[in-house]
């Protein structure tokens, strides 16, 4: 539980490790170093959803939901790769200025 924590304290956090410590979530530092941006991006998306779905909950309830969201974001990358989740724009758009071998074969009529 995060009852002793305040929403003001939460808003001052910046690092993945700070969020994990704030919510008393056990974590592997090496895993976080490798997946930091993806965990934080997923966490950001999940807290946006919490704020949208539960706009009128107390700060304590909101922090509890945020704790669950961070746990979910952290656990997601234990079973999925960043490439599979495609959180960032670079993974969502097809690369530009690339000629695929299949396209060359089709054009050549081979």
From Swiss-Prot:
Keyword entries, A-Z: Nitrogen fixation
Domain of life: Bacteria
Database matches in InterPro entries: NifW
Pfam families, per database record: NifW (PF03206)
Example GO biological process: nitrogen fixation
Known role: May protect the nitrogenase Fe-Mo protein from oxidative damage.
Family: Belongs to the NifW family.
Subunit comment: Homotrimer; associates with NifD.
Name of this protein: Nitrogenase-stabilizing/protective protein NifW
Organism whose genome encodes this protein: Rippkaea orientalis (strain PCC 8801 / RF-1) (Cyanothece sp. (strain PCC 8801))
Gene this chain is encoded by: nifW
């Amino acid at each position: 539980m995060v009852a002793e924590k305040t929403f003001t304290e939460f808003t001052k956090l910046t690092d993945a490790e700070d969020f994990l410590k704030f919510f008393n979530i056990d974590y592997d530092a090496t895993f976080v170093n490798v997946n930091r941006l993806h965990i934080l991006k997923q966490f950001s998306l999940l807290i946006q959803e919490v704020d949208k779905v539960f706009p009128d909950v107390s700060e304590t309830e909101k922090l509890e939901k945020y704790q669950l969201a961070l746990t979910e974001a952290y656990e997601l990358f234990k079973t999925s790769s960043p490439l599979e989740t495609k959180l960032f724009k670079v993974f969502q758009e097809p690369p530009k200025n690339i000629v695929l071998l299949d396209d060359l074969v089709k054009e050549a009529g081979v």
